Every structure is written in C-alpha cells, then in structure tokens.
C-alpha cells in the first residue's frame, strides 16, 4: 500500500486495547511495519476485563484469542508492553519516538508455571478487579494474558531484600534488579488509541458510592459476574455475601450531566441490559430495576432491548434516583422518581449498580505530540496523528474496531 | 518419516509423569529417541531443538506446554513444531504418578507423532491479482471509499445506478453538527466530495449503471454491467458494497396518517427546506405547527425491529431549521427515547434551548386528518398524560432506514446471487470483534447497507472496508488466507476420481467457495476459500484434504489411543474447536481443575471439519464415548465459520445408522456448546459425560 505522503513507512500505535490491537493487526496484515506500545503488562486493555459483550453475550476472550494468534505469527508487528511514549520529535512522515520500557522484573525465560506465586509474601490491591480482591506482588495478568508471562508490581514488591520468588524460580526468570530502558523508533505516522477510563463515581455525591459497600459501578459488576473474577462469578452483596437478587441500575451516572460529563457515553444502556441478564441467569427469581433518562440502543441493539423488555422480571423506570439510604437491617433503600407514573417511590435493593460513563484516558501526552482535543478531551485528527476508538469519542467495541481499521488507512493515506 | 521427539520435564510435567519411561516407550514404537530437557523453552533447549529441526523432513514433536503459549520460543523452520500439550492438559489437571495419567500422556505423544508424520508443508498458491477496487454505490460511503482507495494508490471503478453521484445525501438541506462545539447546523459537503471524486484520475465513475453479473473470485472478479453506455465487462480485485439505504415504505404506515395531505416524510421536508418552501401540501400555507413522529416504522417488530439510529438527530436538525425558516411555527417532537449518543448530546441540549420546540417523550399511536387539513395526533405513555390528543398543521414522519441490499451484485455463486444477510436484512458481520468478517471473501459491505449509522460512521466505515479490501488482495495474492485463519497457506485438495457428486461440500461451504459443474463435481475457487475444512467434514468419501490437516491424519490420531486395562477406566475422545473450546481446556488446566484421565482431546479447525467417519473409527475400536465441543449456534452464532457446530450437530443426527449397525447407544456421542469463557465448566461437562458412559458400561468393542 503506497502512502499518500512521502516519509517513513513505519507506524506507531499508542495503546494496546481493542482499538490499538485491531489497528496494529490490520496494518501489519496489510504489509506495514508496526510498533505497538502498551502501558500495562498485558494487551487487551479494558475489554480484557469484560465478562461478556452485548448483545450476543459472548466472551471477549474469544476475539482476543484470535487477535493474539494473529499477533504471534506476524513478523511485521513489534509489541512493547509496560512501555510509555516519552518523547516525540519531528513531524508527519518523520517522527522520532522515544519509548520508555518499564521493568517487568520477569524476563523472557518465564514459562508461566506459577511457582513464584505461593512464594511471594506480599498481597497487593488488584486494580484489574477494581480493588475487590488482591493478588501477590508477582502475578499473571489474566488467564489469556498476552504476553503469557508473569509480572511484578514494583510498588508492592519488597525487592531484593525478600527475593523468595527468585529462589523458587527454576528458570532464572526473575530479575529484581531489572532497570528501565528506552528504545528509539522512527515512524511516519502515529495512531492514538489511548482508550478510556470509567468516570469516578465518588464525584456524584447523591449516589453514595464509597459509603455503602453494596453500591458498585458497571465495570465492577463485569468483574463480579466473571468466572475468573474476584468472586468466581458469584453475584453476591459485597457487604455480607448474601445473593444479590434485587438489583437496580442507575443509568447516566455522571453522563449527560453538565456537572459531570455533558456527553452521552453511548454504551452504558447496553452494558446495563447485558448485566441484567447476568443477574437473571444466576438467580432466575431475581428482580431488576433500571432507572433511565432514555434507553439508547441504536441499530440492531434495539432487538436485544426488545427481548429484555419482554421479561417481566426487568422493570424499566424513567426517572432519577434521588437518594440512597441504608436501612437498619443493612439493606440499601433507593428513593427514586417514576416520571411516567408521576410518583416517588422507595425500593429495597441488594446491589445498586452505577452505570458510570467513559472518560477519554487523560494520559499526559508526551512532549512533542500536539493534538487538538474537543472540550471533553476527545482527540481530533492532526497532521500525522490519527486518533481511533475511545480517544476520539464514546463508542462500543464494534465501532472501535471499525474505526481502528479505517483509521489505519486514514493515517497511511495521509489525511489529517 | 520419523519426527524427532523432545520432552520437557519443567513446569510440573516431570513431577507428574515418568518421562524416562515415556521416552523409552516412544523409542520402541517410533524408533526415534526422545530427548528430555528440564527447560525446553530455554536457550539450551531451543538450541537442542534447532539442531535437529533444521535437517528434519517433518515437524519435530514437543511434549511440553500448550501450543497456545510460548510459540515464539520454538524454532519453526520450515515446519511449525507439533506441540503435545503435556502441561495444561495433563500435568496440571491429572493425578501425579497415576497409571492412567501416564497412559494419557503416552497416548497424546503417540497421537502427536502420528499427526506430525502426516503433516505436509503447505505450498502457497500465488496468483497475480487485479488491484482495481470496485465500489458499488455513489453515496457518502461509496464516494469516500473511492477517495480512500485512490489515495493509497489503488485504481477504483465507482458504480452508481442513478444519473448523478451523491445518493440520498444530495437531498439534504443541512447536516447535524459533526465537530465541536456540536451546536451549529452544517452546510452539506456532498457536492465537494463528488467534485473530488470526479476530478480524481484514479477513479473511473460509471453512473446510470447496474451490475448484471459478478463471477470469479478475489483478485479476479469478472463484473458485467449494463447502463446508458451499453454493456461493459471488467475485472476487479475486491468489491465494496456501499449501496446505502432507502426510507421505509411509508405507505405501510396509514395509522400514522400517511395518505393525508399534510403528513410528509423527513426526506420530503428536507427537500422543501432546501427550496426554502416549507409549506403545507394541502393549501400551500406556512404551517403554524409542525409535529414530528419519531420511530415511524422503526423499533416496531411489525415494521422494522431495529432502531434506525439517525432519525433523532435528523429530526432535531429539522426542528432547528424550521425554527429558522418559520420563526412563528411551533414544533413538537414526540420521541420514544431520544437517541443522541456521544457528543450528539450537546446538539440535543442546543435544540432544547429553543422555546418554540417542544420535545416530549411519548408514543404516537394514531394520526387522523381533521378540519382544514389539520391533524389530530394521539400520543400515549407521555409525560403529558397516559393518552393525549395534540393538533398540528403538518406532521413529519421520521421514517426508518432500510438497507438497499438484496440482489445487487448478481453473484454467479453456487450458493446464490446475493450477500448473505443477517436476520435483520443487513448484510452485516455477525461478529462484534470483527465487523468486516464477511461470508463472501473479498466483498465488504460498508455504510448504511451494513447497519444503520450516521454520516460520520459512514466515512469511518468506508475507510475500514477499503483497508480490508486492500488487505484481501494483498494476502490472497500471496496464496494466504484472510481472517480468521490469516496467513494460512493450506487449501483443500480434491481427489476427484472418487467424487460421487453428492454436492454436500458445495452446499455446506460457509463462504460459497465451491461451485459445481453440470454433473455436480465441485470446483474450488481457492481465492474465496477460508480454510475452515467444512468441505472436508462434509465429504462422505473422504476425498478432500489439506496438506497439514486431513481426515487421514485425524483418523491416525484416533487409532493411536490405547485401550484401558480396567473396566472402570474410560476412553473418551473430545473433538474440540481450536479457537474456543481448546483454550477453555487450557484455562481449566491453569486453574488446576481435575479432569477424567480417560479423555483424549483432539483440536479441530472448526467442528464443521468433523467428518463422521471418525466416529466409526473411534467407536469400532472400543472408544467408550465421543464428545464434540464447539461454539454456540443459532441466531447469535459464535462460530467463526458460521455453521460449524450446526453442521456437526446435523451430521450427528445422521449417524444413528452407524451406531445401530455397531449396536451402540446413541448416548455415546454428544455435542455441547463450549465457549472460551467456559474453562470452569469443562470438568463438570466431562464428568457428567463420563458418568453416563460408566452407566452404559464399557464399549463392547473394547479389546476386539
């Protein structure tokens, strides 16, 4: 494929979530030289933490498995995990990029046997499970992690003074002295696939997140429902471990609200519909309430919505949750309005799920990247730098892949 | 051929198995010494393998970890090594030191040796590819697709059935905002895009032209067209279907008042506004009130079950320009849910600022003509009350979007002339992770024909489809498969002398890769093939094979399974999909979940490639039961070859006869849906199956 602009052929993709991964693979399979830089020790980003995708309720691991196989066999693609872009110099067609490679403390001799884990004395907060459980300081980042290799959290690890993992590893795979290093890449184009993070629910004071343990966010709900999650897929009240059979969802928790996120996050309605199916699958006698402003299920997703509307166990209530209280017995009590019935009502629930929105990942961009952003922080294309997926606007997984695929052509073709 | 054999004693394998004994047993049977190393994927182990693989005429066999991991550590020149999964699927899920554990490992090694011996190196069939891309449809998507392809150096032929380019976008008066601050209406830009296309020397535009037939395959599609300039014939490398949408047939909506003089559609309003004459058709007067009915036909299983996605923003836009052209008119907008995703919310908020635009949630159930051409509108479930009547001087039906799909390409494929469509009527991919996964290789749908989307989405989609089109021409030209078996150089070979012309392969190929001659003999279009092996599974006379994957090879593996010593011990064959079920097995191992040691897992490219002769092979040898694990079928199918589990299931229905002939119970064969996330369920599934087999008792053929 010829570039529309003169310059270096290489392509740098920043971010290894579903957008960056797809962009890298599509570009490499079309014969381009690609460098993929990911900050975390694994690829897959946010989708690697999803239990299922809407509307097919299939596992995200299925697509990741295919993508990782594509990646492993492609020689045109070089992946750097635990890597951050430190500096970008030059201009469209000729960028010199400095990438910092943070130490993994586990080298490529690791076989993923897992012997190091029981030896490690330190527990750390598991950020992938939003702090709902812990791992040891040495851990495998996921069951289909790519690369399939252990990693050590330097903030938790006690380092050489402990060194028990080093002793038990038969393969000499652990190097607690590993230092960071840098590599310099020369590329013609940059694809920005920096993704999103969930909006901080603590900022929505009326919803009492952090005050009552049985209030969780939608991303936490994904982990609670996941087979490999902190509860092994059991849906239980975090407060006392009782089955979560009465579940309510608060839509637009932060989104469509000028005090928080003025835009619509685009996926939260579908995420809650999907999560309603988790509850009903686990507990057929459960009841679900969804408090919404508008249910937004575009295109064929509407058919999924219609299927759930036909289920009498799910009640859709147009209205806002005004207050959340805790009853003396420990139950949560939701005070909400039902706009269509014109009344306020109270509802006891076991679990309250906040459908928090998506914020463009506010990764401080390295010096040298000058990219215009809209008032919300979403990136706008600029010469040589093409944003894709969530870096650009809220969108679902399918749209991210579409955008990543097309974004490659836009970047190579010289638009922007 | 004697494949060199290496065994790894690391990661718990050496503690679970007596590798020395295994090595000796293999040497006795295959006359090739096994080399044991405690760290086979380490530099020393690798060097040891490398030294032997360079001279080997077949793959080396590695008894170590799962083929899914550490692939980059082992040399693959020219053959990828045959990986026998002694770690995840034996050492990590079986009782250490047990005789049955040892027997399982021995069988897996024997099966691996048999498979390696029957793996030939696929030789890619390279073809000279025509690079021209055909874009069908000259609307927003098609125009952008043409420009994108031309920009990266690919010639384009752009077909449009109308006289002029631009499609429905040409009829738009204004556009909803696409850039920050997402408040102001935009001037249409379609004329500019058309001019760019018409001025581009790499794009050949054929207007007033339609396709008569499309034959051939990627790299060499022969397209015949008919149009004002007469018939034409040309060859293209790949095709983008960008035929766009049509408004839903509004005559089917008499309940919503269509037929009354002052009930119009969104598109008619757009044309009126473009002429600056928003007037009532009945009397030519300026309407004092205009009411928009959203979801006119959409979100209604009796009409269009889907949401048309763009009507909310379109109606908001129209409300705003009515406000400009008719400042005194009241505008009512009755919506079911206001759908303005992402930054579209800013535009919604902008329209809410207008005092004369009333936005109300509700559902319009009836529109009736009353005096003077005015209309009475019944609205239910609104915030105004359970049921209210509103009066308007003009009603606009925001009619939904219907894909302009169907018989456009007139494909000369044995499986029919059109792109396969989903239940919704859109020729879309069924995969969230792979929106361009198509059932007609080299042909990609884009824009509103694929799914409802706005013009921003169409531009993105056009670029995505062009990239996939270029990719298909690039990969296929090298003799390699496109998604999902990207890079696979193997292809099905037909030993046609023995073909019985039963047509099963040509009927079942999920990609329409096989055509037939008059007698019904299959004719492979190799560039359409995606290497799933469905044809190989379908063939009753086993004449279809791949160089590195075939029934003979699988059958040889089945024959390597040993029979147990004790009546209580079972032999169960599990044929599993390599993309979903196989990783699920690995995950069960990773969690150290105990499995029945009588299981022997054989990965398949897809359950669609499962040939039922393997059942007879297995059961007549004394295997107690066969379980197939594949992806979900039905409307929400997961199979990346669409119909793998479904076909396997159908084939199993037909094996009753085989079982009856062998006087065996139907329960000895089972198919279950297993997804990649089902690692936690695998043990339970196999235990249940094993319990059932124990009740039936050992296969009477055991030991015969």
Predicted regions and their residues:
Chain B
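Residues forming the flavin
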Residues: 1-523, 527-570, 579-582, 587, ...
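Thiamine diphosphate
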Residues: 610-619
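Acidic/histidine-rich
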Residues: 588-589, 616
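C-terminal functional segments of enzyme domains
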Residues: 360-366, 674-704
